[in-house]
Amino acid sequence: MNNLKNLRGTVDLLPDNLIKWQNVEKIILELLLRASVKEIRTPILEMTELFMRGIGEGTDVVSKEMYTFLDRGERSCTLRPEGTASVARAIIQNGISSKSLQKLWYMGPMFRYERPQAGRQRQFHQLGVEFIGYDSVRSDIEIIALAWDILEKLGIKELNLEINTLGDFNDRSNFQKAFLKWLEVNKNDLDLDSQNRIVKNPLRIFDTKNAKTKSILEDAPKLFDFLSEKSLKRYINIKEMLKLLKIPFIENFNLVRGLDYYTHTAFEITSGALGSQATVCGGGRYDNLINQMGGTETPAIGFAIGLERLILLAGKDLEESRETDIYIVNKGFQAEILAIDLSRKLRNYDLIIELDLSGASFSKQFKKANKLKSKSIIIIGDDEALKNEFKIRLFNNINVENHEANISFEDDIKLEKWLKTNFLLDKNL
């Protein structure tokens, strides 16, 4: 029993750690609500075929990183490695029309068998935002701006936006033919991993971290040179609109998102706050995905943010938790019953209530309230129980007028008046 522990690449998030997580999530969800983006929840477990068709068999995610197994019905199942394919499947399966515009978000655990490191785990958490049915340049800009605003709102420093265009299907097809011809001549100079990608997923060679291969690729054909006039115009419009919105960016023509379903706009947001440029957000347009998976042709664009890395980068102030408003000190059987009943009533207000369940002496309970920096305390002992009342007072601010009061358990009006006065609660309670 003593040897039982979590799997490598998974982490227990304990209450103190979760304070920052919850604060970060709250800020994100408030911003998404204001942007009229609605939540969607899809299963963590999906049929393996979904990701093979949606992400692409030649990707590292599918070929190396997925957690896949046969269930008791001999069906191949996979713990989701990302969220976009599941959203696309849900759109198709639930008969959502291609003409129905959807702004969706999801947040939850994903699974990839990677080498664990700071900000990257095998079970990791991801925020995803998907705009389904939108094909205008404006939607590309809105999705980039939304991702940028989330990161800025969280106080993340040294942000850099990199953009590229992957063109449409024909652009990529024409480029790939030229690139494969170039690879025939230069493949032996590439690193082994890049050579293996030639057959499976040649565009992913541009993702290489190998310095020598990067240098060689500088002489390779550029996808940008194969863009149609329409694709080029779209890309120019995106750059112009980003400039007007004062969102700084740099062009990175080697930026190829790691999944096969991307078209046109591709972008990444990185931060140098951890000492090196770490990718915080990645996204792009995927107009072919839903059609590729058996649905009708539906344009879409989205992004994903890894929460583990986001937590590392987010501001220190987000580690602070809301302090206890009222600590209920109680001692004696009848007092304990009254304290439980009162705590239930107080939870109807926008206050943090801590009910002491220890049965310890009053002095020890006072020390606990002080340690928690509670703004006020309620005292219920045998005397208060006999009088059917409780004492409430500000804990460390006795100079405030009306800082203390004795209130009957039935006198809700007097209780609300004291709470409104000392906690500045909504006067319409």
Curated annotation (Swiss-Prot):
Query: Per its UniProt record, what NCBIfam families does this chain match?
Result: hisS
Listed under GO biological process in this entry are:
histidyl-tRNA aminoacylation
Record localization? Cytoplasm
Q: Does the keyword Nucleotide-binding apply?
A: yes
Q: Which UniProt keywords are present, listed alphabetically?
A: Aminoacyl-tRNA synthetase, ATP-binding, Cytoplasm, Ligase, Nucleotide-binding, Protein biosynthesis
Q: Which PROSITE patterns match?
A: AA_TRNA_LIGASE_II
Question: What is the main EC category here?
Answer: ligase
- GO cellular component term of the entry, any: cytoplasm
The family annotation for this protein states: Belongs to the class-II aminoacyl-tRNA synthetase family.
Where does this protein come from, organism-wise?
A: Prochlorococcus marinus (strain MIT 9515)
Q: Which InterPro entries match?
A: aa-tRNA-synth_II (IPR006195), aa-tRNA-synth_II/BPL/LPL (IPR045864), Anticodon-bd (IPR004154), Anticodon-bd_dom_sf (IPR036621), His-tRNA-ligase (IPR015807), HisRS-like_core (IPR041715), HisRS/HisZ (IPR004516)
Q: Does the keyword ATP-binding apply?
A: yes
Cross-referenced Gene3D superfamilies, in alphabetical order? Anticodon-binding domain (3.40.50.800), Bira Bifunctional Protein, Domain 2 (3.30.930.10)
Query: What protein is this chain from?
Result: Histidine--tRNA ligase
GO terms of molecular function: ATP binding; histidine-tRNA ligase activity
| Description of how the protein assembles with itself and partners | Homodimer.
For this protein, the Enzyme Commission number is 6.1.1.21
Q: Which reaction does it catalyse?
A: tRNA(His) + L-histidine + ATP = L-histidyl-tRNA(His) + AMP + diphosphate + H(+)
